[in-house]
Design a protein with these regions (language model features):
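Catalytic-core signature of thiol
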Residues: 2-170
Length: 170
């Protein structure tokens, strides 16, 4: 942020927290589904499975996790992807997302226990992950693939950087 302010001679600048929030929820959901597949041979009452199902995902994380999100999905200005009610107050979103993930866990476990091959399981996981993406997009808005960044510098000169991607902006 400070480097952006300096490089572009801005008065102030904020990166979108909602953009990182979206991809954090998506990646945590993906990780959860991978863990469900990896533990499908264990009973629901096993400590690991019970722990996973208790809270499939939640807010927060560690620095290395957010750096990985930046590297994979990039960043965008807050003006391009602003906060929403769901990103500012995530309790309700987390409640629904965790319910959806638990349902998805049951679907995957049932599929695996029915003898489905790994290709069918992977395909189903991708379909479930697409549903999660759709849920997040409806709740938070669709993250931009490309955007224009317009700003006024400290000298009040107007600038536009066109055709940026979140990765190129990072």
């Amino acid at each position: 942020r400070h480097k952006m302010i300096s490089n572009f001679q801005l008065e102030d600048f904020e990166l979108s927290q909602a953009h990182t929030f979206f991809w954090d929820k998506y990646e945590k959901s993906n990780w959860f589904l991978e863990q469900v597949i990896a533990t499908a041979d264990q009973e629901l009452t096993s400590r690991k499975v019970a722990f996973l199902l208790q809270t499939p995902q939640q807010d927060g994380g560690q620095w290395d996790m957010v750096v990985s999100l930046f590297e994979k999905y990039g960043v965008v200005p807050k003006s391009v992807y602003p906060e929403s009610i769901s990103s500012s107050n995530s309790r309700e979103l987390n409640t629904y997302l965790n319910k959806l993930l638990r349902q998805d866990a049951q679907i995957l476990r049932d599929l695996i226990h029915s003898g489905a091959d790994s290709e069918a399981v992977a395909s189903k996981k991708q379909a479930l992950l697409q549903e999660i993406f759709n849920f997040l997009a409806m709740s938070l808005g669709l993250p931009p693939r490309e955007f224009d960044f317009s700003y006024r510098d400290k000298d009040n000169q107007f600038h536009t950087e066109s055709g940026l991607t979140p990765q190129s902006f990072y």
